[in-house]
Amino acid sequence: MIHAILKMGDPRLLRVAAPVERYDTPELRALIDDMFETMAHAQGVGLAAPQIGVDLQLVIFGFERNDRYPDAPAVPRTILCNPVIEPLSGEMEDGWEGCLSVPGLRGLVPRYRHIRYSGYDPAGQRIEREAEGFHARVVQHECDHLIGRLYPTRIRDLTKFGYTEVLFPEMDPNAD
């Protein structure tokens, strides 16, 4: 089932999500299926449960190709419960981000370039991976939703925040 995606200004996006405590349940599987369907419908590269009003530490991400980020390399399809992020260096990298909860806007956001992330899959099996570049950016962006943080709060230079159609006129206006 496709869910409505909460938009910036909705106070539910500012809450800290609760940990997933029960794995491998029909309810968790149904939620994950709904999240993937919602993400695909919105042409997203990731989605966090709080974005559809579910206060759980659950994120999904991954794509082969995405019209909203045409130059981005593929990111493996991942389901991550109770994620933890560890920067593997202090190197930060600025990159343009958008968000399904902040439609039509983009901002230049600093993120760690190289991270390790860990958590659990829907069956409760531990996941641990390293990521760099756009993959690392997507993981950090989605995990921010679990602590009630949206990407505009990370922007250092507000002259690098605006409407996608103004900042990137060459992009398809329906892509964001």
Curated annotation (Swiss-Prot):
Its cofactor is Fe(2+). Binds 1 Fe(2+) ion. Keywords: Hydrolase, Iron, Metal-binding, Protein biosynthesis. The active site is at residue 142. The keyword Iron applies. One of its GO terms (biological process) is translation. InterPro entries: Peptide_deformylase, Peptide_deformylase_sf. It is an enzyme of class 3 (hydrolase). It catalyses: N-terminal N-formyl-L-methionyl-[peptide] + H2O = N-terminal L-methionyl-[peptide] + formate. Fe cation binds at residues 99, 141, 145. Its EC number is 3.5.1.88. GO terms for molecular function: metal ion binding; peptide deformylase activity. CDD domains: Pep_deformylase. The keyword Metal-binding applies. Belongs to the polypeptide deformylase family. Removes the formyl group from the N-terminal Met of newly synthesized proteins. Requires at least a dipeptide for an efficient rate of reaction. N-terminal L-methionine is a prerequisite for activity but the enzyme has broad specificity at other positions. This is Peptide deformylase 2. It comes from Bordetella bronchiseptica (strain ATCC BAA-588 / NCTC 13252 / RB50). The gene is def2.
